[in-house]
Amino acid sequence: VNENGGQTRIFIPKYGIINERRHQLHEVIRLSGINLIIDDMDMPLILKVASIPKERMQVYFIDSEDYFKNRLVQFDKNNKLYKDNDERSIFFAKGVIETIKKLNWAPDLIHVHGWVASLLPLYLRNFYKDDPMFETTKVIVSLYDNQIKGKLDKKVVDKLKFDEIQDKNLSILD
């Protein structure tokens, strides 16, 4: 893609297990500092970046003191699901979309992988549906057969409704 004049950018959560020094992550001040509203709470977005020089590719790390900083991926050290995994997924989805907007980069395609990114298409097509930047953006979702044993918070539907996402788009979560 890059060799043909396109751009590939990667967005991942900055989990606590990612070594910032080894991977030369640094905070992008001009892109950080956005407050994302998650279930009526103001949550500051911290954006860090690293590059893959050989591929001429940027990797953006969506970070949050509350949701990712000192945490593992989906389970805590006692192998229990984090109780706020739903909020973490909402934060990641909104953080990616808001970062793309701040970059003023209209992607042709967004490829979604894994549980933490699973709400991104829902937000893109509902919460951000009137944003002209994403008017022609296509979304591909890769599904895997690695089920998470456990349940999301029962209030996840209410948290999504807070962002004015319609009931008809949430029926699978009921």
Predicted regions and their residues:
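Catalytic cores of nucleotide-sugar-dependent glycosyltransferases that transfer UDP/GDP/TDP-activated
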Residues: 2-174
